[in-house]
Amino acid sequence: AENLKVTHYRNGDAIPTGYSNEAWSNLDDTTTGAYAVYNDNESYADTYGYLYNWYAVDDERGIAPEGWHIASDEEWMELEMALGMSESEANSTGYRGTDQGSQLAGNTDLWYNGDLENNSAFGTSGFNGLPGGYRSSSGNYYDVSYTSYFWSSTVYSVTFAWNRVLDYNYSDVFRNNYYPKSYGFSLRCVRD
């Protein structure tokens, strides 16, 4: 399993990219879908895929390949529960579960050493979550080697959407709805 690396919507239209920090931060005003390469360095994309704002996830042209869709918040919870998280924990926010974050992570060479990697369940699910970091609404890049940020397809409000975070120093999974849609996160697809 790997993070999404598409540069076009399903209909063939190019997904905009190459935005300066200021231009990236202005995408919130137009709700324009876009993607970025961590630190504008294409070699990162080979390993971590691209970082997409949530507007690209929500675009009616479809960002997932034919026969696939971006995982919803509910599908993330189903996955977490299949890995042993209780339903009540899955429905809560913040860090939840026990070792589900470690199960979802993969590739010890890429992660900064911490509780995520040191847990015996590390990498056992096949999900292979990699620490690709994120692009903030200001356009700056953060946390490669330390975190995996994933958008779900589930909206929370005009400004926010549901997401997941794997962090090098936690073996559980972070769920929240307070990152702005303008942030650039990794994406995972589920077969229709």
State where each predicted segment sits:
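Conserved positions within compact, well-structured domain cores
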Residues: 1-192
